[in-house]
UniProtKB/Swiss-Prot annotation:
It is found in: Cell membrane. Residues 170-197 form a propeptide. This is Predicted GPI-anchored protein 34. Induction: Induced in biofilms and in oralpharyngeal candidasis. Repressed by alpha pheromone. Its main location: membrane. A lipid is attached at residue 169 (GPI-anchor amidated glycine). It comes from Candida albicans (strain SC5314 / ATCC MYA-2876) (Yeast). It is a lipid-anchor; GPI-anchor. Glycans are attached at residues 110, 114, 152. Predicted GPI-anchored protein which may have a role during host infection. GO terms for cellular component: plasma membrane; side of membrane.
């Protein structure tokens, strides 16, 4: 303390003497300089050193925590990126599987259609029908004409006193009619099916 007081008093003494020599100036300049130096005992010095070391350790700890937080953030970003990539890969895999299943369904559908068409036989429909028609020339005589497509034959019946007519009978009387048998008809239908496939 005494050292600090001596310095301040000596500076103040110098300034007024300089001012006194300069009589031509009307202004007075006063400068105050304070110099403080604190002297510590060895115990206080070691205590301050330990406080300073603790402060530096605390600053280093905060810096370490900040770097760990930055590393953790980078790790989280990396994990999120990997999770996003895994999710995207999973979605792409699911989409590929759906596309594959759809292609399989289309192929199976086409195969089913092809096998159905190739394994089915087209058979002619055999129907039996009969028709009758008569025309009366005399009240007492009637005739019936029966036609059956089962055996692809046609018949005509005529009577002595009158005539019974039908389209099938007229065709049979006019001349020979080409008759398709079941085997020719089936072969024709199979050839038509082969052309369509």
């Amino acid at each position: 303390m005494k050292f600090t007081s001596l310095i301040c008093s000596s500076i103040l003494l110098i300034i007024p003497t300089v001012m006194a020599d300069d009589a031509s100036s009307d202004t007075t300049i006063i400068n105050t300089i304070t110099i403080t130096k604190t002297l510590y005992t060895p115990e206080e010095s070691s205590s301050l050193l330990s406080v300073q070391l603790e402060s530096e350790a605390s600053v280093a700890s905060v810096a370490s925590a900040a770097s760990e937080a930055a590393a953790s953030a980078a790790s989280i970003a990396s994990v999120a990126s990997e999770a996003s990539a895994a999710s995207l890969a999973s979605e792409l895999s699911a989409l590929a599987k759906v596309t594959e299943v759809k292609a399989d369904v289309i192929n199976n559908y086409n195969a089913t259609i092809n096998s159905t068409l190739s394994s089915s036989t087209i058979a002619p429909k055999i129907s039996s029908s009969s028709s009758s028609s008569s025309s009366k020339k005399h009240e007492s005589i009637t005739s019936v004409i029966t036609s059956s497509t089962k055996d692809n034959a046609s018949a005509a019946v005529t009577t002595k006193t009158g005539s019974a007519t039908s389209k099938a009978g007229a065709a049979a009387m006019a001349g020979p009619v080409p008759i398709l048998t079941n085997s020719i008809f089936t072969a024709g239908l199979l050839a038509l099916a082969a052309v369509l496939l």
